[in-house]
C-alpha cells in the first residue's frame, strides 16, 4: 500500500498489515490478526506531518533487547536511529535519547556526551528516557549523572506483586489523552524514582500502590517488610 501526500510518500509492506505466526504443521506463516488500521494510520501521519521527531537509542553498554520499543516508536511516527555512544556523538537533530537497560556502567567520555546533548548549548529542550536494568549497583557513574539532573532510582518492594507492579496514572496533562484510564498499567520489575530537585518541569507520570516500599539493598535473604516499610505510593515514571 502506497500512501502519498504532496511530495512525501510512505510504502506499507504487506507484512506490516497483518500479524502472523509459524504453523509447524505446514511450515508456513499463518495470518492471525490484522494491524492494517494501525499501520496505515501511522503512514498517513508520517506523510502529512511537517516535522517528525528523531529519537536516538544509545548503545555500546550491553543494553537489553529494545526491538519492541523501536517498533512501537516507529509505528507512532518517530524517526528512530541507533547511536553507539562509545564511538559516536548523539545526533544533534535528535530531540530524544533513550538509554535502555544498560548492562555496564557509562565511562566519563560517554557521560560528557550525554551532558552536552542535554545542555544543548545551554538552550536545553532535549529529553532523555532512562530505562534501568534490574541491577542498579552495576552503574554507579550513570546513577550519579542522573542525580545531577534531578532524579535517582532505587529498589521497589510491592507487597502484592513482587515482580509485576500495578501502577496508577498521576499527571492529568499526559493521562488526559488515554481513552480508558481504568485499565491498570502493569510494570515488570519496576524501580522507584526519587525526585531530587523541585521543578515545575518535572512531572510524575506513574505511581505504585500504597502497598509498596523501598527494598533495602543490604536486606537479608527472606526479608519481609514491616507495615512501616510500606510507604507507597512511590514514583515509577517521571518526565
How would you describe each model-predicted region?
Residues 1-239:
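Short, surface-exposed patches at the edges or C-terminal ends of soluble domains, predominantly
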